[in-house]
Amino acid sequence: MLNADWRTRIRCALAAIAFMAAGAGMHALAQQKAVPGGYVIEHDADIAVNEPGTHNGGGQTVGYSFFKKVPNLTLVFRKRALKPGSGIGLHEQKEDEIYYVLSGKGSMTLDGKTVEITPGTAVLTRTGSSHSLKQVGDEDLVIMINYEVELKPTAPAK
């Protein structure tokens, strides 16, 4: 029978072997999933575009298409400020889309049902649904909009 000192030594040796094996496995995993790092910073003041309400919604809006020029990005991340009286016209959704209200008030019609949206409201519109949005009151309705798109094929280099 081994005494307590030998049992402790064996446990430590086994723990060291397990730790080294796990480290080697993690290193191999890191090698497989290595991706180049980096980041992109954009400020809304640099990308603001005055536009009419999208989807023939009327009125004036300010659109901010963050990271629009970043290649191979499938996430669309936008901010839109709807000026008083403006809106986003009724349209059918081609992909899941999320709206999040930062400030102001709006009236959103979702598949024929109208609901009020206020700061802190998040709305998920699913593929095939229809919706429109109208700014309400004296304050701009400021929203964030997120959805994914498929990557566009790139032309082969000549």
Annotate each PLM feature.
Residues 113-128:
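Short acidic-glycine-tyrosine-enriched beta hairpin
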Residues 13-24:
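Bacterial N-terminal signal peptides
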Residues 94-97, 101-106:
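Glycine- and acidic-residue-biased ligand/ion/polar-headgroup-sensing regions
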Residues 76-93:
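Conserved short histidine dyad/triad with adjacent acidic residue
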Residues 2-15:
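Bacterial N-terminal signal peptides that target proteins for export
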